[in-house]
């Protein structure tokens, strides 16, 4: 709509004025082509991104200790294979722009809105996995909701599964479950192996389990100093 086009024009004009970035328009499609330096130079990408978000993930002189938005956002969207889904990145930013900016914040996006964006991206990603691809994942994560803080020892997962009789439940419905765990016959160890192969968890060098934020937040697991899990 006209409002969106006006915002797009403002963004391009700001890029040209502040960063000397000239946008060209494709003659056939009329699409705007991002300047080469904005596509390939990380320093330029960071500067433009921080012109939108501000330079830190917290206010005050020590805000840098919480991280820098340009790296903080993708780092919190990484899966266990060290990959970021473009859909998750766009979902996080789409959610972030919905929040009102505090009067004393001089940038279009506030760091708390970016954190809320990660929560939304996590909700969407987990919903995709549990509803569309691997419904059994929801069943193995439900007993852990609100009861585990990562990184943690593997027994914190397996003991809760034992209390919930998760493995028995999966075995009883194995034939009816779409894409059941491949290593279910190995019990809890096999389930952990499947979660790791899907990129949902990581096994650290010391044997503890870590879960990327893009999954952890929606699955309701805690992490000290991390984005708050959904309730």
Regions found by a protein language model. Give the residues of each.
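C-terminal leucine-rich, beta-strand-based interaction scaffolds used for sensing/assembly
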Residues: 36-231
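The catalytic "switch" region of P-loop NTPases
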Residues: 1-64
